Amino acid sequence: MGKHYLNSLFAPKSVAVFGASDRIDSVGQIVFKNMLECGYKGLLYPINTKNATVQGQRAYAAIADIAEPIELVVIATPPQSVPGIIEACGLHGVKAAVIITAGFGEAGAAGIALEKEVIEAAHRYNIRLIGPNCLGIMRPSIGLNATFNKGGVNAGNIAFVSQSGALCTAILDWAQRNDVGFSSVVSMGSSTDVDFGEILDYLVSDPNTHSILMYIEGIRHARSFMSAMRAAARIKPVILVKVGRHASGSKAAMSHTASLVGADDVFDAAVSRVGVVRVQTITQLFTAAKALSCGFRPVGNRLAIVTNGGGPGV
């Protein structure tokens, strides 16, 4: 595919990890270990203000100490440090950032103010953001595992995009047991910048992606989202599960990632109109992933149903 404006997120030639650490089971330790063990094919730099080395690699106290340009940074440091990090990244010419750190819009007034600082700094330097409050991003074909998920993932042709990091972890664990691989795994978190529509725009033209699964808690930019879903569904199967079918679910989603959850019947009608399949449960989403992983795509109306009763076949 040609150079997409989100290439720095999905195909970075260099990555720096803020908060990379030797402290066992810390988020920074797991992220950097994943990057090393999954065989990332680009340049990799740990940034740690206290240590000269991290996991056997030379560490840098600041991004300004790195002579080479950095396309993507992964941030796993306390929330108060993130606005300053984004500012420093902008001065260094960074194109994209994955903010794993939580404690922003979902954490009350102080977190909302901090999130605003991060967004303003990113906009000043045209840095695109995934997160905050997310698991991270994976591109197995290039060894990019910028997540704190314990365990890898096989390369495949399914893209999975989710606002829930916990659900990402669950489906990745399940996929390993069921031999299902992924072209991309994107944990959106609070989706303060890059949204579902932009991710779909990338995936629809990605030759490694043959089908797309999504877990949605809420949509911020409905018009661009529906346009992107319509374009994607014309070319590739798109299957999603969305919470908020009931009032209690909508309230829980709002408190989880500060998402805006719209009227469910309106969403249902819109999804159906653009040709996207909505499933009702997480189990059904897992089943869809297994079905899509086989690579078989029926064409036309030559489908036979074998059943031991009339009801199940209707």
For every predicted segment, state its role.
Residues 1-314:
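Catalytic-core regions of core metabolic enzymes
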